[in-house]
Regions:
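Electrostatic, structured charged patches in enzyme active sites and in nucleic-acid/phosphate-binding
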Residues: 1-204
């Protein structure tokens, strides 16, 4: 049975839950919906069958980085399951590809290989900081300091403000917030630590 999360989105597996964490962290994503459509297709010997993809993902139209990204109709599968049962899934996926193409979307299968990476761990860590509010003057001070330093790491950035650990700890959530908001850049494909290289992000 599907499980309901706090925001009402449903998921049937922990892998779907992990994908939803990535989508919530993706600033190009507008909304996503679980089990969005039921697709009819002909199975063996012309028998009418139905298939319900796991998710549909809509991208934002108000920012340049997302404007040209297509809507994605998606299925979530473990790679081993996909390999072992591909013959069973193939007619369903073919129907979904056709359904998506007719609407100008794309159909995509997400596997654990693509989902469960260091990026996921970073996304899950940073998500609680994404929409938190901090004083504008504090945010501006951190941004201006990292612009001065050009490239640094969280440890060095905090040390440039305070020598004592208490004040550094008080400021650290602001750094995580700015990384989550992509105001500060870093390589999120690698584990995020206090020694990770960080820099100011600029957008056109």
């Amino acid at each position: 049975m599907p499980t309901v999360e706090k925001d009402g989105q449903e998921f049937e597996s922990s892998l779907e839950r992990d994908l939803m964490s990535l989508l919530r962290f993706d600033t190009d994503v507008d909304t996503f919906v679980s089990q969005p459509v039921k697709i009819e297709y002909q199975g063996k010997e012309g028998v009418l069958c139905t298939y319900t993809p796991d998710i549909i993902i809509y991208h934002r139209k108000d920012i340049a980085s997302a404007r040209k990204k297509p809507t994605i109709l998606g299925e979530v599968k473990y790679k081993d399951d996909l390999c072992q049962n591909f013959r069973e899934y193939h007619p369903k996926f073919r129907a979904a590809m056709r359904y998506a193409k007719e609407r100008g979307w794309i159909f995509k299968v997400f596997t654990d290989v693509h989902i469960r990476t260091p990026y996921l761990k970073n996304a899950r860590f940073l998500l609680p900081y994404l929409n938190k509010s901090y004083e504008h003057c504090t945010i501006q001070s951190v941004i201006e300091r990292i612009e001065e330093l050009r490239e640094t790491n969280p440890h060095e950035l905090l040390a440039s403000f305070y020598l004592d650990k208490w004040n550094q700890a008080m400021l650290l959530p602001v750094v995580w917030h700015l990384i989550a908001r992509r105001s500060i850049g870093t390589n999120l494909q690698q584990p995020l630590t206090m020694s990770s290289r960080i820099w100011r992000m600029y957008y056109e």
